[in-house]
């Protein structure tokens, strides 16, 4: 414990790291303040019904990604989700369209063009999501909440137009905050913004769960402690999933330049068990809307009730299958064995016992397929853990932290940020945050 506090003290001894942490903290405060600022012309006291309907399903995911701003009808209501959607589209284009694949391989200049395209696509997504959000707002909250329309005489069209432009500006500002944190702060800015939004909900979730359990009928203090212990082990399991890798040995050929010898050492390619991150869960949650949509055509509404039951067997079974399928799909999109084999060949590396070229591609593809199977099953189980927690009597707010997107984002972003801090400490010859000095982050969200 003494060594841990010594390490924390060392963090603040490094001037650059201290400045980066301070800069990150200030920008996060700006973001959290903006999440509480309600759109002009709306009575915040009449938003209760809308907030109640933004707790579950895909809408709940949007609310989580925006740090509650979505349910607050805030100027930051659209948050970073449009940017994430645009990033996913650009990633898919880089896989399936040769022009974008070529851009991706052009180094820094190609990355700048891809980033510019992502920004343009973000604006396009905002133009769709903004009006859709305002339409949902009109359907969910009472008419008297729209003060600008009722008391100031604004037409619905102009009010919606101005509100949409404000939210678009807010979302672009959040995106800018994320980029500033990445460039001048610590960690990945966009990921940190999402994580802070999730963390902001945690105290409320703990208090709500404690309030329910500290009664004579719900298990009391002992049950609350048992839940916290179980949650701790779930967090450990999530860390294991994020950190786990299959190391493929790589040998580099010896080269002699002048009087110095290079290469000849054995290294490893770390193939992550969960290379897809949280994206399969996000895709699966989005896709779960379609069975519900088709079920509405059922005249008895029995199918809709079955598929719309978040704690029911069929919903979670289909959700689990979707997560497994999308884990394989997204891993195939993000991990390119052909490119890895070419990079090895270019640098004079080879896998012992495997011929360079096509055989290396086949070997890497085979290994990736084998490690993805347990990874996808484990990810699927973590995705449906919140439903099991709800069935066992855990409060809905706290249950979301027992697995799923919330937990994986929290674990992944914290590990990424600690990894950056670790690198600063090791560069200045201080002890790292972990005994080994080798903290492994995620490959991406």
Predicted regions span which residues?
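N-terminal cationic and glycine-rich segments that engage phosphates or anionic surfaces
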Residues: 1-104, 109-445
């Amino acid at each position: 414990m003494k060594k841990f506090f010594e390490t924390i003290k060392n963090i603040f001894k490094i001037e650059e790291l201290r400045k980066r942490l301070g800069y990150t903290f200030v920008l996060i405060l700006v973001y959290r303040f903006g999440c509480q600022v309600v759109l002009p012309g709306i009575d915040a006291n009449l938003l209760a019904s809308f907030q109640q309907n933004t707790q579950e399903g895909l809408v709940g995911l949007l609310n989580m990604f925006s740090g509650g701003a979505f349910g607050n009808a805030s100027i930051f209501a659209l948050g970073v989700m449009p940017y994430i959607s645009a990033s996913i589209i650009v990633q898919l284009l880089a896989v399936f369209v040769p022009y974008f694949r070529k851009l991706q391989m052009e180094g820094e200049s190609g990355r700048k063009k891809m980033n510019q395209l992502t920004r343009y696509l973000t604006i396009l997504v905002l133009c769709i999501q903004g009006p859709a959000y305002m339409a949902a707002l009109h359907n969910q909250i009472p008419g008297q909440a729209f003060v600008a329309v009722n008391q100031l005489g604004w037409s619905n069209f102009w009010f919606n137009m101005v509100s949409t432009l404000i939210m678009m500006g807010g979302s672009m500002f959040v995106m800018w905050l994320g980029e500033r944190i990445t460039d001048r702060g610590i960690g990945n800015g966009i990921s940190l913004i999402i994580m802070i939004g999730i963390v902001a909900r945690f105290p409320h979730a703990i208090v709500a769960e404690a309030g329910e359990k500290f009664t004579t009928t719900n298990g009391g203090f002992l049950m609350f402690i048992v839940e916290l212990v179980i949650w701790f082990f779930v967090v450990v399991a999530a860390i294991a999933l994020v950190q786990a890798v299959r190391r493929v040995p790589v040998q580099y050929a010896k080269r002699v330049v002048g009087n110095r010898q290079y290469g000849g050492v054995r290294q490893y390619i770390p193939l992550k068990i969960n290379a897809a991150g949280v994206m399969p869960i996000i895709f699966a949650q989005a896709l779960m809307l379609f069975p519900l949509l088709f079920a509405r055509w059922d005249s008895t509404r029995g199918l809709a009730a079955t598929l719309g039951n978040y704690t029911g067997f069929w919903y979670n079974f289909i959700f689990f299958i979707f997560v497994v399928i999308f884990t394989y799909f997204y891993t195939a999109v993000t991990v390119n064995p052909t490119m890895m084999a070419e990079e090895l060949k270019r640098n004079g590396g080879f896998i012992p016992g495997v011929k360079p070229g096509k055989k290396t591609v086949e070997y890497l593809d085979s290994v990736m397929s084998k490690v993805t199977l347990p990874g996808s099953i484990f990810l699927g189980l973590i995705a449906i853990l919140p439903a099991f927690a709800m069935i066992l009597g855990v409060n809905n707010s706290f249950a979301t932290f027992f697995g799923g997107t919330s937990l994986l984002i929290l674990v992944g972003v914290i590990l990424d940020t600690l990894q950056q801090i670790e690198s600063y400490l090791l560069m200045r010859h201080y002890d790292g945050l972990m005994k080994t000095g080798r903290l492994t982050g995620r490959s991406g969200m």
